[in-house]
Amino acid sequence: DPDKAEYNYVKDVDYISGAAILLSVDLWKQIGGFDERFAPAYCEDSDLAFEVRKAGYRVVYQPLSKVIHFEGVSNGTDVNGTGLKRYQVENSQKLKEKWADEFKKQCVNDGNPNPFRARERSQGKKVILVVDHYVPTFDKDAGSKTTYQYLKMFLKKGYVVKFLGDNFLHEEPYSTTLQQMGIEILYGDHWATGLWDWLKLNKDEIDVAYLNRPHIATKYVDFIKENTNIKVIYYGHDLHFLRLGREYELTGDI
């Protein structure tokens, strides 16, 4: 499902499919184009991505780039036949041999790998989960603008940033703005029902939970404290204790 949250934010990846690659002519010439050892087809796109990184550049997935790819139409799907598809197996071995040292640095596949880090090449980076009541509408209210500025700061500091809006909605143009910055937003029914299991599964991968506002923090802080070792940071935004105290004086309830 291309509309799933995990497929719709800009991120570093191992390689980009040959169905849709964009790089500058200068970089193409610097690398020397596709390595001819992979002719006539298969793995040349994977190899190109490794060459791009070797040259000091990033390989980035752009979710707003969309193409329709008819799998197998050009060369079929039989890797054991006599057609061009057979080169997929042969060239995969060539790729492993050429980049053996690089493959050793990848996430270990023990037969049941957790793709949390491998899918965005975040090995060695700190991960922060930012939770607020909804995606920051940064041109409408001060609280949202504050959250938005903190998100940008976390990115600048080198964090991998995940954002959770407690209403689990995808709100435009704000959601796409965050996703284009490289922030994964946890939205939709899947996350509304599966968030707690996700936190347990990835408790050793998330370094910090940054909780905004008292009514949001109270919903999440106990679960995080009781089920994970994630460091919790609370940001109140306002002097809520003063407001709540005055409300209690007037109404006898809060």
Regions found by a protein language model. Give the residues of each.
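Acidic/His-rich active-site region of diverse nucleotide-sugar glycosyltransferases
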Residues: 1-32, 37-39, 46, 54-55, ...
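Extended catalytic core of nucleotide-activated donor transferases of GT-like folds
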Residues: 5, 134-153, 162-254
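Short, flexible hinge/linker loops that cap or flank conserved catalytic cores
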Residues: 7, 14-15, 121-123, 226
